[in-house]
């Protein structure tokens, strides 16, 4: 017995709907890859889930400088005559292409600066790279000297602050020791003044031998 025909309608159960979506999406993307490889066809598939999650596939073309999806959409627009984006989007696309090309050129220059891919360059281009490297080395040396001078200046400032703090601590120690001596001298001086001001009878002990003889 053959399988019964499945009615195509929205699946109400969210879990079953998600499972079916995952299976069908995987099948579509697999078929897109297969037809691209087997038939050397350009295929572009864009799928959005009900939650807005994107799944896409485009047959890669290593000879093209444009992103695969942009290339396919541009080709579709040219062949179908349908306008997929307005002048604003065209301008944005052109800006993206310009930035991408500029980035590619910078990557090439960076490889040249690192000594890579130099075989295809002319002597004039090699001289320009050498001058750029020399200028970069000079700028780097100047920057390092600036950092060294700043480090020495900060080191001198810290040394001066340390000397100032040491001087203040020493000054406080001197003032503190001088104050202690003044207190000690004042204490002895007060003792002498107190003894001198006492009456004679209080300053002589009654048990003194001379006093006993006088009695």
UniProtKB/Swiss-Prot annotation:
Which SMART domains does this chain map to? MADS
**Domain (MADS-box) ranges:** 1-61
Tell me the keywords, alphabetical order: Activator, Developmental protein, Differentiation, DNA-binding, Flowering, Nucleus, Transcription, Transcription regulation
GO biological process terms on file: cell differentiation; positive regulation of transcription by RNA polymerase II; regulation of transcription by RNA polymerase II; specification of floral organ identity; specification of stamen identity
Provide the Gene Ontology terms for cellular component: nucleus
Q: Does the keyword Nucleus apply?
A: yes
Q: Which Pfam families match?
A: K-box, SRF-TF
Query: Where does the UniProt annotation place the signal sequence?
Result: none
Where does it live in the cell?
Nucleus
- Organ and tissue specificity: Highly expressed in lodicules, at intermediate levels in stamens, and weakly in carpels. Expressed in pollen.
GO MF term set? DNA-binding transcription factor activity, RNA polymerase II-specific; protein dimerization activity; RNA polymerase II cis-regulatory region sequence-specific DNA binding
The residue ranges of the K-box domain are 89-175
Taxonomy, superkingdom: Eukaryota
Coiled coil, from the record? none
Checking InterPro entries in the record gives: MADS-box/MEF2_TF (IPR050142), MEF2-like_N (IPR033896), TF_Kbox (IPR002487), TF_MADSbox (IPR002100), TF_MADSbox_sf (IPR036879)
What else does the entry mention about this protein? Antisense inhibition of MADS4 expression transforms lodicules and stamens into palea/lemma-like and carpel-like organs, respectively.
Q: How does it assemble?
A: May interact with the K-box of MADS16.
**What is the role of this chain?**
Probable transcription factor involved in the development of floral organs. B-class protein required for normal development of lodicules and stamens (whorls 2 and 3). May function as a heterodimer with MADS16.
Give the protein's recorded name. Answer: MADS-box transcription factor 4
What is the organism of origin for this protein? Answer: Oryza sativa subsp. japonica
Gene, per the UniProt record: MADS4
